[in-house]
Amino acid sequence: MSANAELLWLLVEHLVLTGLPAALAALLALRLGLRSVPLLLALALAASGLAAILAFWAYYADPLVGQVAAFLLALGSVQGIVLCRPDRLDRAVLRKLAAPAALWALGSAFIVFLGFVHGGSDDPLVLATTRFSHPLPPDNQIPAHFAEWYFDHGHSATPPLFGDWLSSDRPPLQVGYVLTQHPFGWDESGLHYQVLGVVVQQLWIVGMWAVLCAARLRPVARGMAISAAMVSDVGIVHGFFVWPKLIAAAFVLAALAMVIGEDWQRLRNSPAAAALFAALCGLAMLAHGASAFGIVPLLALAAWRGLPSWRWLGTAALVGLALLAPWTAYQRLADPPGDRLIKWQIGGWLPICHLIRRSPGGSARR
């Protein structure tokens, strides 16, 4: 198989596997009567992220449980989509949803083939550190390293360090995306992981489309805005160097679409909307901790547009707690201390002081 044919095959595989839970959520909501495109896209993104974090915890419980969960998520999504009878759903809304789906696939293909236009598919993760930028640290490999450990070992032992990084230092959502698709075919070179990483990073396109629809821009303006963002330095560098910043952006953008949309006055009194909003914010934090810098002003904007009810706030708090508490417990109990990035960014302190562990290379690190 030629390099380009292999890339195309992997691209289609990971687009389909990533999109299945999202498509099921959107079609089910449409069948139940929801017609708002921004809300349907927000639901789709939330379903995608929730499937990934569910897979992460299933693998952590036991690798066999994780693999069963991965197959059930994929096959269950296919069955659910069939049962939704898309041919009987609102064609006009389906056409509106097809546009961001097509742009997501197009954006993924653009980054993948631009990244490998000069070859390098035999060592993709190293290529990604220099392809569009000055040499970057190997942070793009961290989720792959820990995903392999959980895939083989679950919670049976504490994962070994990657360089100086503990498994608790970075949120687990991208690890979860890897684990959902690992059983369907993988490799040792990292090419599967790289293509999947690009596909997941490009979910920002769906989130941004939701924002542009909520802002009631015309289709031409939406297309121009998305195209400009796709070819920007941020879109290309962070799209190919697959650390999970753009995944987090997708969820924050979807939450923003809820706040700025014309339905906010109704949504701020709906517990279901509270659960969706909190899930998007929680998934953003489980993708990248820097999401807090977007979520805090987003909460201020939501309050300015109309304070939610106490019931809404309570529902949101419970959903956020359900998503974030297990990871916080893991950080504190399974692989402490879990706060090294905060100490580093605020206090300039990175060393692990209270334990000695062995890195994958076998050298002792303090």
Per-segment meaning from a language model:
Residues 1-117:
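Membrane-embedded, hydrophobic transmembrane alpha-helices
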Residues 23-27, 75-85, 191-217, 254, ...:
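Transmembrane-helix motifs of polytopic, lipid-linked glycan transferases
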Residues 33-43, 188-195, 202-231, 250:
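Transmembrane-helix signature of polytopic, membrane-embedded enzymes
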Residues 52-56, 312-366:
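Membrane-lumen/periplasm interface segments of specific transmembrane helices
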Residues 57-67, 234, 275-304, 320-331:
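Transmembrane helices and adjacent periplasmic/lumenal helix-loop junctions
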Residues 237-248:
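Short acidic/glycine- and proline-prone juxtamembrane loop motifs at membrane-interface regions
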